[in-house]
Amino acid sequence: MSEPKCEPTKWHELTAPVVGDREHYQKKSWNPVKHTWGPYTQKGPAPVWFADANATNWTESMIAKTKDLFYEAKLNECFEKGDEVAIKIHYGEWNRTAVLRPEYIAAIVEEVRACGGHPYVVNDTTLSYHIFNSMAYSSYQMEGAIRHGYTSATFKCPVIVADGFSGEDDYRVELPEGLILKETYIGRAVAEADAMIVIAHARGHAITMYGGVLKQLGIGCQSKRGKYITHLAHWGDPHDAIGWPKFTDQCPGKACKFHEMCDNSCPRQAHRVLEHGKEWYPERCRLCYSCQVTCIFSGMGGITFEENYFPNAMIAHADAALGALKCFERGKVGFINCAIDVVPECDCFPWANKAICPDVGILASKDLVALEEATLDLIDQAPVSPGSVAEEKGCKVGDDKFRVVNGFSPRITMAAAEKIGLGTRQYQLTHHEPVLTPENAAKWQIRPDQPTTVRLRETFHRNDLATEVMPFRREAYNKEWVWNEWKKFDPFKGEPAG
Amino acid sequence: MGEVIWVDMQAIGPENSVGHKIRRLLQEAGVLGGLDAGARVALKINTAEEGYEYGLRPAFLRTVAEAVTNATEQIPTLCDGLKLVDYWRRMSGSSFMDVVSRQGYSSDTLGGNFVINGGFSGDEGNIYPCGGADTVLGGVEVGAAVCRSDRVWVLAHVTLHPLLGVAGALVNGGFECLVGRERTRVLAGIDPYPFNGSRPGRSALSGFRHRALEGHLGVRQALEGRVFYVNYVWDVTPQPEYFPFSEAPVGPSQGFLASRDPVALDAVTFDVVAETASPGGRTAVESAREAVEELLSVAEALGLGSRTYTLRRLS
């Protein structure tokens, strides 16, 4: 690692804490871009492996299949022995229920370690997003992560906030290739890793329409500074451009029962509720979404987004994803999408709506765009879940589900991603169906080399606990009830009267 | 004149266990009453280097964390910075957390959120002035977990220190709260591991001590003085926790001392350690005395506190 190129701080001129400015920070920062970064696929369609969500025996456990795919997709070749391997996941908002179960992450951590890597699980802090956000503040984020079961005890490796205590521990990455962004900021625990395995919960997203592995890079790996940039904060003029909140004439002012929440939703006090409507101080605003999302979550319409904001943000987050990918040598990042609990919204929402389709399965690849494209196609081909917002909006099998549900097609992002060199949209899908053999059944068990029954055999040989209390006490019982009565409780016919 | 409270190790019993003693220390020091609901308190602790085997038991720190939680209704942050070993390569946040975990320290065992002061890189922080124009450093960069908190309690595992004499409140509340690159700057080329045969000269050592204490001024500036110190005189080893090994303690454990004055606290602490050293540990303690004298006198001259103290001993 090279020393930062920066002017020495003029220590003796200090009279108060230094408030960093853009110039100061950029001089302190240095660019971690690897010389050989690039899309994994050089030519032709990219291989993508898929294991569906059905399971009927040991080998078909979703966890077992996740481990299989890790090797099938050659993610074990993303790192060398001794490499520091970041496992990038989403820690999930407080009260969010549709987050990945810790077991999926533990499974990959186990295999990274088994292959000689040094894994650690990471996620960056977020911007405030809404009034009760738990992820903008690193200590709150860790409380939420623990509540979701994401702990060092669960994973047997460190669980870290990638961009530090305050979200400022980052690197600046230059993006001359970007369609919109020309720079971004990546959390250091990501940028300093030798390799990375990204495990994404594939589901919808209110801003980018869909969130999978690309979203994990394009927002998830961005530090606070990176997220502000990716949000397109301050693009254009405050009153007509996309990078600012849109204040409508629908704000009822203090007549709104949420007006105190609204006032408190901004960490910079950039707006204030008046008797009628709102007053806004654009010079204080940084576009963290707090006011917009708090208003929308409250079911009100006073503060919202510019209509063209979303496709622009989708393209920008592909640029930002490139910033994360450039921190690694080509082929040093592996990707897994878990299309499970495919709900309409992001894991940064403090709730989860009904899934828009049944669980699809697990996908893995070293090409993130191909993986995303395959995931989207499989989700689109899946049935529409009854009672979901997808059904409510008239979505049919084969429709672009996230366009129907969230407004724009996520393929906008994928096209942008392909254009700037994140990967290819062409993929070759291999359906992985494990064969039930004794070896495969044992392979991913807790003690593959010694069946539990054999272990218990040894234990029972020393002390057979059942024998000590046998014969168990048996008394006369109502045979009519046990043999016949229960047959009458047919749930579809109802319990017979009397 | 600094006021120091000492809860010693006498009269241990079912209602006077080590936990009771630590809680009593906090009550007698009157610090819990000063905590407002919602206050963000950071507890600066020591997480030992791999190979150092006399680190404080997590329960000793958890007791304080629980007291803070009760007073503030907030889960406190516990933090320590990256060590100095091979700073640019081995000391990534992930390997630091691995070592921390092996010592038995986690958010579960410590009763609060454990974070790296300075983030994954150890370099996340803000710059604060150390005092006037006559200071050597001018300003220092204080780790984010410390400088972004409302209050900091320094829970120092007291040990001897090869460069500074004693590692107590002054070292842990100052130099140890700085970001990694700042500590590199304060060291100014001094090898902190004299066991490698690289003992620095007297002049270089004096310069380092002065700079390290100026760093403490920067930390106090960051917290606007809202710092409280507890010295755990427990398993006082000849080596500090950043060493990759530890010899047997220099004497029996003497309990817990606390003060708002780090100079008075370290002065009392060293006196207690010296008076109670075992025959086998006396040589190590006496060989540290000169460095401790210099540390305390420079600290007093810099305005960090007073070497004159009143001691309230509670058994």
Language-model segments: residues:
Chain B
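Extended, low-polarity segments enriched in aliphatic/aromatic residues
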Residues: 2-80, 85-315
